[in-house]
Amino acid sequence: MHHRTGDCRSWQTFNGLATGEARCGFFGKIVIAPDAQRTEAFQENHNILLSDTARVNSKPRLEIYADDVKCSHGATVGKLNEDEQFYMRSRGIPEEEAKVLQMISFVAPVLETIPEDATDGDLSRPAIAELVESAIRSFA
């Protein structure tokens, strides 16, 4: 993302799930040009490792050449929350379904940024959500 003029706003959220022998990389960069005063820019990358052999390399970057801006970035890499799994299992949800629900809830905030009525061919928000859930269930 390159902000070249003032009073810009951007919010980037990237959530990733890595399983098996996956090697994932996130190399984000936001540039704020000298004339882009009063810009607000945020970048975040969150990842969940679903196996002991999956790896994620996350490098968010900010290049700021203006002095009146509000910018931040962040990255996390972790595993599924065992306390949440225990809670769901204690209420009768099978372990695999609990993991699926955790993964779906992890990616849901990103899916919700797609406008409800957005369509690009067959890629409406419900169609994308269905594809994501199907993919999650295939490797859970």
Model-inferred region functions:
Residues 1-140:
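Active-site gating/interface segments in enzymes
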